[in-house]
């Protein structure tokens, strides 16, 4: 896949604000400050498309981006796990994220971002288990690998795979928004996602 166009569509807090749902969607999810916006910008070759912030917990909306003139939508979900956000807000975000992932019929796959420098958090593990439980096509992307040496990444790769634990059917892609490492691999996965059949979560339940 080659991305030649990317445009912001809308922001939403509930299904009433979502786009119509006539295009395949791929969602990006991860804890606060994991580098989600930077990854999206790198993948679509647009520096300011997804708003980046040095303040964790800043993204409070579900943001939709149209890719390649209606080929599919990228969906940027709010970051989870930021302790300084009030409890009621964290609960609201959790319901917002789960509601989208569970109810969105045009969802084709999820990109779960994990900071390559750290052991997956309890929230990371919970999200991964949830996606597995509902059989949502998933790829795990380890961000900020440019901060690690090759030896450090080799060790962290093993830690991440063991901690989740990573299913054999799921890939772990090392990614750097600085160098572009992992971009082509991720684009290939996105292409595979949007050509899959739909996910019927209601039927699974």
Swiss-Prot record:
Pfam families assigned to the protein according to its UniProt record, in alphabetical order: MMR_HSR1
Keyword annotations: Cell cycle, Cell division, GTP-binding, Magnesium, Metal-binding, Nucleotide-binding, Septation
Biological processes per GO annotation: division septum assembly
Binding residues for GTP: 30-37, 57-61, 76-79, 143-146, 175-177
Annotated gene: engB
Protein name (record): Probable GTP-binding protein EngB
Organism: Desulforamulus reducens (strain ATCC BAA-1160 / DSM 100696 / MI-1)
Role noted for this protein: Necessary for normal cell division and for the maintenance of normal septation.
Domain EngB-type G: 22-196
Cross-referenced InterPro entries: G_ENGB_dom (IPR030393), GTP-bd (IPR006073), GTP-bd_ribosome_bio_YsxC (IPR019987), P-loop_NTPase (IPR027417), Small_GTP-bd (IPR005225)
GO molecular function, one term: metal ion binding
């Amino acid at each position: 896949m080659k991305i030649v166009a990317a445009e912001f569509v809308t922001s939403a807090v509930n299904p009433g604000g979502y786009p119509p749902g006539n295009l395949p969607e791929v969602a990006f999810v991860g804890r606060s400050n994991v580098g989600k916006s930077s990854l999206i910008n790198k993948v679509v070759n647009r520096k300011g498309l997804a708003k980046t912030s040095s303040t964790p917990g800043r993204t409070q909306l579900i943001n939709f981006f149209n890719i390649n003139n209606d080929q599919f939508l990228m969906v940027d979900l709010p970051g989870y796990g930021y302790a300084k956000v009030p409890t009621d807000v964290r609960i609201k975000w959790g319901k917002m994220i789960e509601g989208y992932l569970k109810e969105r019929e045009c969802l084709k796959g999820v990109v779960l971002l994990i900071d390559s420098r750290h052991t997956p958090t309890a929230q990371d593990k919970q999200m991964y288990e949830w996606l597995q439980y509902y059989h949502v096509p998933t790829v795990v992307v380890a961000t900020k690998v440019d901060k690690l040496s090759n030896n450090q990444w080799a060790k962290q790769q093993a830690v991440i795979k063991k901690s989740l634990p990573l299913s054999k059917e799921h890939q772990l892609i090392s990614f750097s928004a600085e160098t572009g490492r992992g971009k082509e691999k991720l684009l290939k996965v996105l292409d595979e996602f949007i050509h899959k059949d739909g996910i019927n979560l209601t039927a699974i339940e």
